[in-house]
Amino acid sequence: MEGCMGEESFQMWELNRRLEAYLARVKALEEQNELLSAELGGLRAQSADTSWRAHADDELAALRALVDQRWREKHAAEVARDNLAEELEGVAGRCQQLRLARERTTEEVARNRRAVEAEKCARAWLSSQVAELERELEALRVAHEEERVGLNAQAACAPRCPAPPRGPPAPAPEVEELARRLGEAWRGAVRGYQERVAHMETSLGQARERLGRAVQGAREGRLELQQLQAERGGLLERRAALEQRLEGRWQERLRATEKFQLAVEALEQEKQGLQSQIAQVLEGRQQLAHLKMSLSLEVATYRTLLEAENSRLQTPGGGSKTSLSFQDPKLELQFPRTPEGRRLGSLLPVLSPTSLPSPLPATLETPVPAFLKNQEFLQARTPTLASTPIPPTPQAPSPAVDAEIRAQDAPLSLLQTQGGRKQAPEPLRAEARVAIPASVLPGPEEPGGQRQEASTGQSPEDHASLAPPLSPDHSSLEAKDGESGGSRVFSICRGEGEGQIWGLVEKETAIEGKVVSSLQQEIWEEEDLNRKEIQDSQVPLEKETLKSLGEEIQESLKTLENQSHETLERENQECPRSLEEDLETLKSLEKENKELLKDVEVVRPLEKEAVGQLKPTGKEDTQTLQSLQKENQELMKSLEGNLETFLFPGTENQELVSSLQENLESLTALEKENQEPLRSPEVGDEEALRPLTKENQEPLRSLEDENKEAFRSLEKENQEPLKTLEEEDQSIVRPLETENHKSLRSLEEQDQETLRTLEKETQQRRRSLGEQDQMTLRPPEKVDLEPLKSLDQEIARPLENENQEFLKSLKEESVEAVKSLETEILESLKSAGQENLETLKSPETQAPLWTPEEINQGAMNPLEKEIQEPLESVEVNQETFRLLEEENQESLRSLGAWNLENLRSPEEVDKESQRNLEEEENLGKGEYQESLRSLEEEGQELPQSADVQRWEDTVEKDQELAQESPPGMAGVENEDEAELNLREQDGFTGKEEVVEQGELNATEEVWIPGEGHPESPEPKEQRGLVEGASVKGGAEGLQDPEGQSQQVGAPGLQAPQGLPEAIEPLVEDDVAPGGDQASPEVMLGSEPAMGESAAGAEPGPGQGVGGLGDPGHLTREEVMEPPLEEESLEAKRVQGLEGPRKDLEEAGGLGTEFSELPGKSRDPWEPPREGREESEAEAPRGAEEAFPAETLGHTGSDAPSPWPLGSEEAEEDVPPVLVSPSPTYTPILEDAPGPQPQAEGSQEASWGVQGRAEALGKVESEQEELGSGEIPEGPQEEGEESREESEEDELGETLPDSTPLGFYLRSPTSPRWDPTGEQRPPPQGETGKEGWDPAVLASEGLEAPPSEKEEGEEGEEECGRDSDLSEEFEDLGTEAPFLPGVPGEVAEPLGQVPQLLLDPAAWDRDGESDGFADEEESGEEGEEDQEEGREPGAGRWGPGSSVGSLQALSSSQRGEFLESDSVSVSVPWDDSLRGAVAGAPKTALETESQDSAEPSGSEEESDPVSLEREDKVPGPLEIPSGMEDAGPGADIIGVNGQGPNLEGKSQHVNGGVMNGLEQSEEVGQGMPLVSEGDRGSPFQEEEGSALKTSWAGAPVHLGQGQFLKFTQREGDRESWSSGED
């Protein structure tokens, strides 16, 4: 594999050499041949010696044989050479293996040597002990000898004493006893010494055993470490696979978005064309009305003329002909059903003007032939006007009619309307059918689909009459056209006195023309005014039209809702019936709409735009019809056809009203498709109400007035309607989230949860939506069409089916819940009810506002959840994906149900919302347990990290706390804990969501009262923390919706107090470098406090929900900063209060974060996770981002001082940010629970909470860093350098000549590449370390060395792999220059790829990311936004904004990185660097971008770093896998080629994390990472971002991976050069 390029190059060279030799030989032979031929000629001339020729032939044959032999020898030599080359390659491989083995053996020898040295040391110590004991024994022996000598001396002295010469030897016994005594003493001493020696020997043996056990334990630890690393590698591979799936879905979503955008553009163009056509149609219809009047006059004149002619001629044949021709017009009325028949019917009267005798009045008087007045007589009149018969071509009537009518009655526009309408109606009809296929079928209102025929097959006049459904006569003309179409046939015969009749007719037509012209002038004046008004009002009307329609719909819905509420309240059991009846009425109305739409098919696309016009036209049409009625009555009284024509305008008025209503219905159906697939209930309500209000001329006026008033009120009360919209939005989003994790729950529970979260999120989003309302209302069409099209198309169909299903379940639920909810909700409805009513008045507002954000979240959340869940664990992922798929549908159903419920009435919604609150509390308990289970499982999967263990401990403690807390609070705490667990795992996610809900604000306030909660073990610290946090965030004006401004002290004052307290305990607890041990204690203490304070705060549902969220955050942020577990607990409680959905969301996120927590790469991943969750909840993003930002800030400070630096700085710095009243971060405001008018205060509070969250995030990240191993940055740098050197050496050794160096250089640093050229996800540790750690940890300065070691090993392995992949690399190398993301091109592709993501403005539904729409803007703004916190896209998950900004940032940073191609993004973020980075005024975004780049490898630096490594060197490979696939990721991918997962991660992270980072950075930046760089308030983001460079001056160190930034071509050159070398 490795030698492929070398062999190929050598073969080419050999072939060239052989070719040259061959050519030279040929040339020589040719020259020789010439010489020989000349010689031959001479010889032949001399003599024909045949023997010489034979000799020459023989010699030539010999030479040829010799040549062949030489060639064979040469081929054999070449084969031998090739074999030798192969052997050489094998030898080189074996050498590599031997070198690796030698290295391993050297390491083993070093370990053994160290063990031997340890043994020697132990032996020396023991020998010294033995020597000491021997010396002591010797001393004792000496002393004993001396003592014995002394005793012997004494004994010797005794006999010397003069003894009685004769006395017996008395002293002998004494001497013996003394000797015996001394011997015993000596033996005892000896035994004692021997015992001591034996004891010392045993102790020495035990010490040796202990040493052996320690050595064995070390070996086992190493084996276990290897196993764990392998596990982590597998998990990282799974994560990479999941991320690839996510990226694929992102790409699909982007493509779908592009398709929808194209469709929207096409619809816009069609709309403009239809607008112009509408004006023409209106003119045509008005002129047709005038023609009808004039024709009615003609009818009378015809009668008189025919009667006079008949009487004058007195010819029975003529009379019989006339009578025969008309005897059964009614029989023929139904004849022309086909377009041909109609045209024939329309032409026949034209051909036989004399055949209109007396029977005609009867037909005119009948309602059926009323349309004959329109078309039949319009066409019959043409000959009278032209005074010449017109040939029977189907097209003839219209030009003749046009010419004559223009001459006498009609303005020039009539010709245009009729003549031009021929062509227009059919395509329009086709378009209308395409747009509204369901409504094409004929309905019960219209006989036998005649109206459809009218629209499809009628003559141009018919189309002219049909095309403008907006004109007064339209529906009546059409309705009667099908029936009376056959009556045209009755004029087959011509009278004999045709010429005389023509003369009379012309005279009378002149008279009638005058009358008609006067009428037409009046009508035209009115209609001109109408047109002007329509045109003038088109722009505002288009905006107001949807609102007015929504208002009309909701006025009708109000009645329906009032009725439905009455029925529900009175007869809960009857509610399903009424709903079913409503559905039936809706179905029948939809059928009718379909039938009407058939007629209106031409106008239908127009109706979208015409809705605004319909209202003014409705008013003016009614006025015009009234005036026409009066004039018609006056004119017709004098004419025989008075009654007929009089009836006609009356019916026309009614029909016009009905047609207008039907148009509105069809428009609402279109709106359903465009804005809310769920509008169908509204449309159905409209349709049901409109048959009731067929005489809506006045209602239409009132509707318009109400529309205006509603629009004004909407503008005034955007926040209020948004509240309901927000309720709906998050009710839908949350059920999606809850359903993702708990799809098995019944739809009823989901609906209840949805309603509950609606109340919460109504308050939260009311703020942000209040601000965004105007933005959304301004371009509702743009914003709605793009996100709604895809979402609506996806959702609308199942929703229609599911709406019915949901209506059934909702009926049952509503019956049960209405009673309890009514009482509960009446209070909340006082404020929310009005807003809901107003919101219901403007369903448009709901649809646009809801759809961009909710549907984004609804659609995005499943993706985000899938992103998070895949990270949780593959098992959880699989289950979660299944649940996501199942429950996305269910959530769509819940959305449908939601719309229906919302449409029903705000009361029901509120009732159900409270009902949901109750059920959710119950569910929260179950969910908490489930989340604990999942968390425990995840914890088991992640046993490596102490965080996991602490987390499990915390979970258990949370459970205990939940049990301790009152039952009502227990549910909340369970949910909270579950969510906190989830959030802890999602650590930042939970925080995000807590901030997101703005419940942090409420909870900060509520939490403070909970500080004193008796059960809280650490009430003081928590109080301090809570006070600090609540004072930080909450004191800034956060007050619970209930007005729970429970902030303990002045915001400014308590913040400092709370901070010092929080910081001190944190510092104390965190004094442990890891902060893990101390933190568990803090967690334990804080957990009960959190659980209980959360529980205490919870009692008030508003407070519980809002307040707990904050306390959870505050305590989480404060107490949990030391321990991640505490964060999870607090997050759990807070999020439990926030809702089980958050639990679910955070469960996914927690799974991801939690799994990432153990991994050293977790910090890098947290930002992605944050990004994802941020995408899930824009505001929550802010929260998470705050965490990651500060987490990064934390990590930004050296790991050794994790808490003092991170948490203290985070907390201390956060308060100023929190205190900054300027926070305008609307997503957070959106999250703010309750009405909370103090948007800024709540924002600040949420910021404070976020700041806490950030501090906690920092704490977590630092803990993670510490847990993962706090590696000084210096070692990282050294490790990276050594890695680079080793990689270079290995590359030099292992690189086959043919392989481009770029790949190899990249390979060691770059994470593994799969043979497919995809990055091989290294084990999690490696992924985090390689992809993230070298750059990320280097930036973190914590984990780089392990990652370096792993990367070094991986680099070696990768060298082998790279050699295996060399062919692929070469292919990639050849392809790479063409790949969009090839490193040489990386900077451009990066800018380009983000554009794709940036393009969909649908992602940024607030349009905040509009700046990212352009690639350049996306790149520039992406950098700025990332630097600035991406406020433009801050709330956006949108790949456009966040991805664009991240990509832009990554591309910009990459641009910076790429600019310094050699930058090995193993930027050792020393404290100094971090200080520089943090010191840079960068906003939280910068901090996140850098911090995330630092600790998190925050997908920007780590991605840019590791990715740039990949881009620069591996870029060619990565680009195929990552750049192309993950356009966004590709941007980031090129950094150091370190992030194999970085591509996937960067893509997800870039897609999700980039979004997350951008958003987390947006928010997180917005979350002032003050700790990082005095970043000031989140809004200093922009200022700081402007100040900061993407790298904030962090020194970039060349990494191994970045040695060669090859465009593949360079790599190719290198490979060639190496091959030639």
Swiss-Prot record:
Region (Coil 1A): 8-43
InterPro entries, per the entry: IF_conserved, IF_rod_dom, Nestin
Region described as Tail: spans on this chain: 314-1621
Spans annotated as Linker 12: 152-173
UniProt key word tRNA processing: no
Linker 1, as annotated region: 44-55
Polar residues bias (residue ranges): 1486-1495
Record-listed N-acetylmethionine modification sites: M1
Residue positions, PTM Phosphoserine: 311, 325, 355, 358, 398, 471, 476, 548, 564, 578, 588, 638, 680, 702, 746, 768, 790, 820, 831, 842, 894, 905, 913, 934, 1016, 1261, 1282, 1286, 1310, 1347, 1409, 1418, 1452, 1496, 1498, 1577, 1617-1618
Subunit structure and binding partners: Forms homodimers and homotetramers in vitro. In mixtures with other intermediate filament proteins such as vimentin and alpha-internexin, tis protein preferentially forms heterodimers which can assemble to form intermediate filaments if nestin does not exceed 25%. Interacts with FHOD3.
Protein name, per record: Nestin
Organism, scientific name: Homo sapiens
Gene: NES
